């Protein structure tokens, strides 16, 4: 008889971000191994868009206990710290049920960048949210240490990510352009530090911005030399990775950055700042280059062997990510 995993999330299934991508791939592996996966997300409740950040949904969860009884899960995983995650956490703590959680997003840094909220106010809330979790899954060893530095004292586990190799693979017989092509894939929003990419002045380079978001029209007006191609997924997205000579990752506050390993799987080296996310993902001088001067990182990355970049991406596997997720589930009782 298959066991049921309940994933509690404040993301809708049709959203496109690293968190949703992670769980879709984990779900596929779980189903293959005879697990049943059920989501408790804002779609089950009334919700509104977060002002200024429409991709974030603010739900108003009700009758959580009844929903949990109907689902009857063997394991509960709380993926996000939003209203749905919070309400379920409160119910589980009140009734003595066990669960694990995940820390995917640097909310304290994000809230500071977007709304000016001091991190000293938000880190205690994040720490409190995960306090009773049987296991806290986060992206890398570096993030494990960061959470511990902020007072997390539970069992924290590094949880890797993977790549769909059926979609993200190197170009086959397609000549690269003589003009350097620099591609960035991201939500087009303030906190992503995209100006660092958009303002790059690498001689002769063609810059392509893939993605959508609240700053898109503003950036399109301010940076007419950049090609803004909008939102892309699947094979269409992979085509942009493959056509790039360098994938530029300007963000300084990611916990991981799945787009980097998708680019690597396509044989495209990454240029980034030496900060969390890139430091854990990039093999310096093999799959990418890091430098506080992003233009220099691009220049160095252009010299890398695309075959070695692709080979270096082999360590990222959804099967491995699923094994870590599965092995750190906790029984609800």
Stretches with model-predicted labels:
Residues 162-180, 218:
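Acidic anion/phosphate-binding donor-loop and adjacent secondary structure
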Residues 130, 231-232, 239-244, 325:
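Short alpha-helical donor nucleotide-sugar binding micro-motif in glycosyltransferases
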Residues 124-170:
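Donor nucleotide-sugar binding/catalytic pocket of nucleotide-sugar-dependent glycosyltransferases
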Residues 252:
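Aromatic "clamp/platform" in nucleotide-sugar-dependent glycosyltransferases that forms part
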Residues 217-235:
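Nucleotide-activated donor-binding/catalytic signature segment of Leloir-type glycosyltransferases, i.e.
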Residues 8, 174-204, 208:
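Conserved donor-binding/catalytic core segment of Leloir-type glycosyltransferases
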């Amino acid at each position: 008889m298959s066991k049921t995993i309940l994933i509690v999330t404040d993301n809708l299934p049709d959203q496109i971000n690293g968190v949703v991508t992670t769980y879709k791939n984990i779900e596929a592996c779980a189903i293959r191994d005879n697990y049943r996966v059920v989501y408790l997300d804002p779609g089950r409740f009334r919700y509104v868009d977060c002002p200024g950040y429409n991709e974030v949904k603010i739900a108003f969860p009700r009758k959580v206990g009844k929903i949990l009884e109907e689902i009857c899960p063997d394991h509960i995983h709380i993926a996000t710290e939003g209203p749905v995650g919070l309400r379920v956490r409160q119910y589980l703590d009140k009734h003595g049920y066990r669960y694990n959680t995940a820390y995917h997003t640097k909310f304290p840094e994000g809230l500071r960048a977007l709304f000016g909220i001091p991190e000293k106010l938000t880190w205690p809330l994040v720490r409190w949210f995960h306090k009773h979790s049987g296991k806290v899954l986060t992206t890398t060893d570096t993030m494990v240490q960061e959470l511990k530095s902020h007072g997390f004292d539970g069992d924290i586990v590094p949880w890797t990510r993977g790549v769909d190799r059926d979609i993200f693979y190197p170009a086959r017989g397609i000549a690269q352009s003589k003009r350097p092509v620099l591609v960035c894939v991201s939500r087009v929003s303030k906190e992503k530090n995209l100006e660092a990419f958009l303002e790059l002045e690498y001689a002769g380079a063609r810059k392509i911005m893939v993605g959508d978001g609240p700053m898109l029209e503003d950036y399109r007006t301010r940076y007419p030399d950049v090609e803004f191609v909008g939102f892309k997924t699947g094979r269409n997205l992979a085509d942009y990775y493959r056509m790039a000579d360098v994938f530029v990752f300007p963000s300084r506050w990611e916990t991981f950055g799945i787009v980097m390993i998708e680019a690597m799987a396509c044989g495209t080296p990454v240029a980034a700042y030496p900060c969390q996310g890139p430091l854990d993902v990039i093999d310096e001088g093999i799959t990418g280059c890091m430098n506080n001067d992003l233009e220099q990182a691009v220049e160095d990355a252009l010299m890398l062997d695309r075959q070695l970049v692709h080979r270096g991406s082999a360590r990222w596997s959804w099967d491995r990510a699923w094994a870590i997720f599965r092995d750190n589930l906790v029984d609800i009782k």
